[in-house]
Amino acid sequence: MGDKAGTRVFKKSSPNCKVTVYLGKRDFVDHLDQVDPVDGVILVDPEYLKDRKVFVTLTCAFRYGREDLDVLGLSFRKDLYISTFQAFPPIAEERKANSRLQERLLKKLGQQAHPFYFTIPQNLPCSVTLQPGPEDTGKACGVDFEIRAFCAKSIEEKIHKRNSVRLVIRKVQYAPEKPGPQPMVETTRSFLMSDRSLHLEASLDKELYYHGEPISVNVHVTNNSTKTVKRLKISVRQYADICLFSTAQYKCPVAQVEADDQVSSSSTFCKVYTLTPTLDKNREKRGLALDGKLKHEDTNLASSTIVKDVTNKEVLGILVSYRVKVKLVISRGGDVSVELPFVLMHPKPTELPISRPQSAVPDSDPPIDTNLIEFETNSFSQDDDFVFEDFARLRLKGMADDKDDDC
């Protein structure tokens, strides 16, 4: 692969190989003030096109029920956003300046290639998948973004799988460069028949954690009451706000520790507990929110959702947050608990170079981008420094394929 380093481009063709879509990436980042534009190129066989038009659609959909329950004309799916772009013949009012990658692809692919553009609205949710149960089949519930390209005389014409291209992209967020303040919370509890109180203070070592990183929870108890703390329960909880027809919140523990540490009357206690929330220990929990999936490789717990304007009621989809709960189990009832919110996300990846000079000879094979799978030999000449990759379909545990054969 050392001689094929360069600009990587994702491609996917229709089953009849007459329509092919090219995209420079599959993950589009929400920067809070704007979202990466979706710009690509569609290549159509001129003999197949004839007098038809070329359309590309971008759809953001929320599936909130199993696909096998879609009966009697009822669908457990709501389209949150649909945008249509006519790539050919082009509409003058919709034309935009081509990106550098589009210009290079158009030059490479010839006159039968046409650019398309989409702008993802900021109020749309990020891609999230709800973990299916062991017996679930069909498409998993969650929010996904799909691009579909096809040829038709009009947009209302029925679209057939064999002559259209469907591919799933993701809207993602990465960890902010400046994390928030260190979480700390305290509470004081008074008990009946006790003159003095119990004081609980809990804190985390930081506010922002990356996936797979251990979380240190510092617990400090000052027990001046006559009660005895029998044990402590520390848990990491995922909260998923489902914003659709109405707002509902679901919580699920993703890591927990139960310690038999006792705090007797008129004593103090201090200890640091460590928890690491991972998907590996939660694979059987149906409905757990996961990061949107694009390929057969594994995913992870859903990243925290960062909302620019928390008062915006137009945000639909699934909003994910995390909290650490510290609970003191007190003798004869009257438990005491506090919660510490934190952020769980991926770090912003290092930007890869757009292209490598032809004269540069790598010492070893370049690392494979995690977005790239199923390497395909580049049949084009090397002068434009392109590497074309097949665009893999969405797969999940217990999830069937699209049933449209690639060429």
Swiss-Prot record:
The keyword ATP-binding does not apply. It is found in: Cytoplasm. Pfam families: Arrestin_C, Arrestin_N. Keywords: Cytoplasm, Sensory transduction. GO terms for cellular component: cytoplasm. The keyword Cytoplasm applies. One of its GO terms (molecular function) is angiotensin receptor binding. SUPFAM superfamilies: E set domains. Coiled coil: none annotated. GO terms for biological process: G protein-coupled receptor internalization; nervous system development; positive regulation of ERK1 and ERK2 cascade; signal transduction. Belongs to the arrestin family. This is Arrestin red cell isoform 1.
